[in-house]
Amino acid sequence: LDKYPDDAIQAGQAIKTVDDANQAIIGIYAAFKDASLYSGRLTLLPDLQTDLVYAVTGYSNQYGDLWRWNILATNEDIEAVYGALYAIINRCNFLLDYIPGVQQSTTDDDALDKLEMIHGEALFARALCYSELIKLFCNSYESDGEAENELGVVLTSHYDSVDNTRRASLKDSYQFVLDDLELAAEYLKIDENSVSKDDLYSTTYINEYTVYALRARIALYMKHYTEAIKYSTKVIDSGYY
């Protein structure tokens, strides 16, 4: 008999309702707390490469190669960061692929509003992961012309992608992030009349101004300083932070 495991869900049945989509986005939020990401290596390893850390006599040489800037291609800590970021991208792609189907089968306006917010959160999460990958594994962005000939990252926009896994250009990689952020900002647009200053300041969820903050950071990476000022000013002038 061809039986499916009792403790698993077939991919095609995983996201059928808005509640399913909400559970998926909660899982994406939780994935950022992975020991290889913001609860560990992604924040720890860069610190080890700065003057914030000094190796004393008798230390165990843990992370010693990173501290000495003698990093081999076989470094497992670097591999873990890379893999964890792409794992979240994969989860975002899975959710984003199924959102249109959920939207078609949903008639309640409040549920559709919730789904739109989830859509924006997933787009932001994917953009954030790609921005980290670009920052860590690509050369710096010097100009639009040079970026066309620099290697970027492997871009995937669908869970079951059959595209060749070749690296896009640095320019195209950044454009992918910008496109995701632009769409995310539309889905996460805040109704100024329905949210309080304190609620938005203390929220732990992605919102319109989270998108603008990352957009400003990306502009800095790209040396588009006017854009960086534009989007950072949106956050500052909002009065929420």
Where are these regions (language model features)?
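Residue signature of alpha-solenoid helical repeat architecture, marking inter-repeat boundaries
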Residues: 117, 150, 172, 199-202, ...
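Conserved, well-structured interaction surfaces
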Residues: 61-137, 168, 186-188
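Membrane-proximal, proline-rich intrinsically disordered regions
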Residues: 1-47
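Residue-level signature for tetratricopeptide repeat
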Residues: 129, 216-218
